[in-house]
Regions:
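Domain-length accessory/inserted modules outside core catalytic folds
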Residues: 1-185
Length: 185
């Protein structure tokens, strides 16, 4: 699905001195977009662009805003498709394995924009368990956070971590696997 959006140009911009100082890199930003789209309540583009790029949309080059809007629509269409089409942007290490942590951090940044709503979702017992694969990339083997989350993100992570501690690993991941790999709602 990502053929329609020029992600190479966006990646170059995000890595350049022209981008805002506090902007996310491409994988983080893609995780943020997925989180915004999956949010229990709508998040305005002004809010998520400022969170992801460290600047208001009016302060950004038009092509950057347009590219992000196109990627947002691409993700939303994939998630609305039956079956869902999810193509997250992960980095690949030189050794060949995928690095999902940056994407997961971006997703959790979206969670931090409406933490109470996400907490309600997790406590409702409906779909909160689907966060398990994302959170697994945020916690090391000893159960410690591998990033420095804000207080709000920490609240959400603690809630999910408690659920992880009370659930066998195989059971927590089994329900989100399909023949084509992991799903994200």
């Amino acid at each position: 699905m990502t053929e329609g959006v020029n992600l190479d140009e966006l990646d170059q911009y995000l890595s350049s001195d022209e981008s805002p100082e506090n902007c996310m890199m491409l994988s983080d930003l893609d995780g943020l977009l997925h989180g915004v789209i999956c949010s229990p309540i709508p998040i305005s583009s002004d809010v998520w662009m400022a969170a992801g790029l460290g600047a208001e949309p009016k302060e950004l080059p038009n092509w950057v805003v347009n590219t992000l809007t196109d990627r947002y629509m691409e993700i939303a269409q994939g998630l609305a498709h039956d079956p869902m089409v999810v193509e997250p942007i992960f980095w690949q290490a030189k050794a060949g394995h995928l690095i999902a942590m940056d994407w997961c951090e971006g997703f959790m940044k979206a969670v931090s924009l409406n933490p109470k709503e996400w907490l309600r979702l997790s406590e409702s017992g409906s779909d909160g368990h689907l966060m398990t694969p994302i959170l697994l990339h945020m916690i090391d083997e000893q159960g410690n956070l591998v990033t420095s989350p804000s207080v709000i993100e920490n609240l959400a992570l603690d809630t999910y971590k408690k659920r992880l501690d009370n659930r066998p690993m195989k059971d927590s991941l089994e329900h989100i696997r399909t023949d084509k790999g992991p799903r994200l709602l």
